[in-house]
A protein has these predicted regions:
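Core catalytic region of metal-dependent phosphoesterases/phosphodiesterases
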Residues: 1-31
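Conserved beta-sheet core of the metallophosphoesterase superfamily
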Residues: 5-6, 45-114
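Active-site flanking residues adjacent to catalytic metal/cofactor-binding acidic residues
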Residues: 9, 37, 68
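Short, flexible loop segments at the rims of nucleotide/cofactor-binding pockets, characterized by
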Residues: 12-16, 39-45, 62
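Core dinuclear metal-dependent hydrolase active-site scaffold
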Residues: 26-37, 41, 104
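Active-site-proximal loop/helix segment associated with metal-binding centers of metalloenzymes
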Residues: 30-32, 93, 132-135
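Short, surface-exposed beta-strand-loop junctions and turns on beta-sheet-rich folds
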Residues: 42-43, 90, 119-122
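Charged phosphate-binding loop/patch that engages nucleotide di/tri-phosphates or the phosphate backbone
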Residues: 107-135
Length: 135
């Protein structure tokens, strides 16, 4: 099945300043620990109790670091963590970047990440990682 969750953007004036809504969170899918954040580093709009993203990469707390903020799609491995920015889907704020989204195929032993650029049926970027290779 599919799993959908979200974290608010830093300029989401309703949800980001609301302590009842997680600005950053950890989830687990098929044994992969995933950290979700809008920004890849701390932001001046953060709440006092927000997790600092800088402390997550390479700490062993997450296998996947999923972030946005820059609107630039990318997939890279950093200090044993797969870092993914799906890009953006907001046509009214292109910031010079094409419309993109990420598809994560997660199995207990393997992760395949595809970045699709719209319009288009094929991935622009596709990378596969074995969980055992991240350690």
């Amino acid at each position: 099945g599919c799993f959908l969750t979200r974290v608010p953007g830093t300029w989401d004036t309703v949800y980001y300043p609301d302590p009842g809504v997680s600005n950053r969170k950890f989830i687990e899918i098929a044994g992969w620990r995933i950290f979700l954040t809008h920004t890849p580093e701390s932001h001046y709009n953060d709440l006092a109790d927000d997790i600092r993203p800088e402390t997550v990469i390479g700490s062993g707390r997450a296998d996947i670091f999923l972030f946005g903020h820059t609107h630039i799609a990318e997939i890279r491995r950093r200090n044993g963590t797969v870092c993914i920015n799906p890009g953006h889907m907001s046509s009214d704020e292109s910031r010079g970047c094409p419309l993109t989204f990420a598809l994560l195929e997660i199995d207990p032993d393997e992760l395949t990440v595809s970045i699709f650029q719209l319009p288009g049926p094929h991935p622009r970027i596709r990378k596969t990682y074995r969980k055992s290779d991240l350690r």
